[in-house]
């Protein structure tokens, strides 16, 4: 085998299509672009997603209703008023609330909201607090840990 004997495999090389070189060449006259219209003209065509001036789908979609959030943040929610039955200086976590029966299902990390009143000092450990809940827990002498 010598370099002078090497040749590409049969069928691996394809000739470039030469358009606009007469009718006999197969792609003469309009070069395969049809008669008229925007797609037959020279230069760039339309951008991706262009729908002829109509509001394109990618701009219509957010305006429509009933689209679900792809990755929603789900929390197990407890209001401050539900914590009044607990004894003073108790450490409140999602597990302790489930054991006490205040929360029945684990829907995700614990979030404490500020509805209701609290008169007992508690050590609350949760993933998130509303501003009102944090103020009420600390006003009752408790602490909040995220």
From Swiss-Prot:
InterPro entries linked: Ribosomal_uL15, Ribosomal_uL15/eL18, Ribosomal_uL15/eL18_sf, Ribosomal_uL15_bac-type, Ribosomal_uL15_CS
Biased segments, Basic residues type: 11-20
One of the GO BP terms on file: translation
The keyword Cell inner membrane belongs to this UniProt entry's keyword annotation: no
One GO CC term, this protein: cytosolic large ribosomal subunit
Superkingdom of source: Bacteria
Spans annotated as Disordered: 1-52
HAMAP family, per the entry: Ribosomal_uL15
Family: Belongs to the universal ribosomal protein uL15 family.
Assembly mode: Part of the 50S ribosomal subunit.
Protein name, UniProt field: Large ribosomal subunit protein uL15
């Amino acid at each position: 085998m010598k370099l002078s004997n090497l040749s590409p495999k049969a069928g691996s090389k394809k000739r470039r299509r030469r358009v606009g070189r007469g009718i006999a060449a197969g792609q003469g006259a309009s070069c395969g672009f049809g008669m008229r219209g925007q797609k037959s003209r020279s230069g760039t065509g339309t951008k991706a997603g262009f729908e002829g001036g109509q509001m394109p789908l990618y701009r219509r979609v957010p305006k429509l209703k009933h689209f679900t959030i792809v990755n929603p943040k789900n929390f197990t929610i407890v209001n401050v008023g539900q914590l009044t039955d607990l004894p003073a200086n108790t450490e409140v976590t999602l597990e302790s609330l489930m054991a006490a029966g205040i929360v029945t299902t684990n829907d995700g990390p614990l979030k404490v909201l500020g509805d209701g009143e609290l008169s007992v000092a508690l050590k609350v450990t949760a993933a998130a607090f509303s501003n009102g809940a944090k103020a009420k827990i600390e006003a009752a002498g408790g602490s909040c840990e995220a």
